[in-house]
Amino acid sequence: MSVSMREMLEAGVHFGHQTRFWNPKMAPYIFGHRNKIHIINLEKSLPLFQQAQKFVRQLAANRGTILMVGTKRQAREILATEALRAGMPFVDQRWLGGMLTNFKTVKTSIKRLKDMKAQQEAGLDSLSKKEQLTFSREIDKLEKDIGGIQDMSALPNAIFVIDVGFHKIAVAEAKKLGIALIGVVDTNHSPEGIDYVIPGNDDSAKAVALYARGIADAIIEGRANAINEVVKAVAPESSDEFVEVDESAP
């Protein structure tokens, strides 16, 4: 589903931060200011968001993985919901240092979580009450820390980040590994190093919902397009030729 200028306006995407906190590198995306608040130029934001969606659509069509990241209070629930809808991994609580650069260790934790879930399903009757409590605390912590990436078997092809400044460690890790970055950048942060910059408000819950929904929609569209292409490729070509049947034949 495409996003319109009106939707961006209604979501408050154009509201930046106070002018005294601005990053000069965001100047090309700023329309002006009002009441000491920078106003983001939506005529720049909309096509850039559409470019990001196009990239995501193509990546999803090629079975790529997009890790969705948003750990700020107003982003957590909507980001997790949209990532699950799109079938993509996500980080909605806190970014663990080394989540990408030390993925080998993270995979060990993922295996531990899956093993514990299997043990939980089988029953914990053999454990004492104290052991059950310890078990419960550990699985809850693992679920909170890496639950959103438990099905991510390899490093992602791209990362979608809401607020690049707040998630500077995630951004740095992605840059180090050459992973494509799609980032919502507000007026108080630098767009440098972000492959697909989305200039916009990173605090408004409505704006965050718009970004997350738009990216999730693009992922779903990309996968659907890929499936349609496969169906077309394997479907027998229909023939409109008229074939006469000889009814006298035995």
Curated annotation (Swiss-Prot):
It comes from the Bacteria. NCBIfam families: rpsB_bact (TIGR01011). The lineage of its organism: Bacteria, Pseudomonadati, Pseudomonadota, Betaproteobacteria, Burkholderiales. Belongs to the universal ribosomal protein uS2 family. This is Small ribosomal subunit protein uS2. The keyword Ribonucleoprotein applies. Keywords: Ribonucleoprotein, Ribosomal protein. Pfam families: Ribosomal_S2 (PF00318). HAMAP family: Ribosomal_uS2_B (MF_00291_B). The keyword Protein biosynthesis does not apply. GO terms for biological process: translation. GO terms for molecular function: structural constituent of ribosome. InterPro entries: Ribosomal_uS2, Ribosomal_uS2_bac/mit/plastid, Ribosomal_uS2_CS, Ribosomal_uS2_flav_dom_sf. It comes from Verminephrobacter eiseniae (strain EF01-2). GO terms for cellular component: cytosolic small ribosomal subunit.
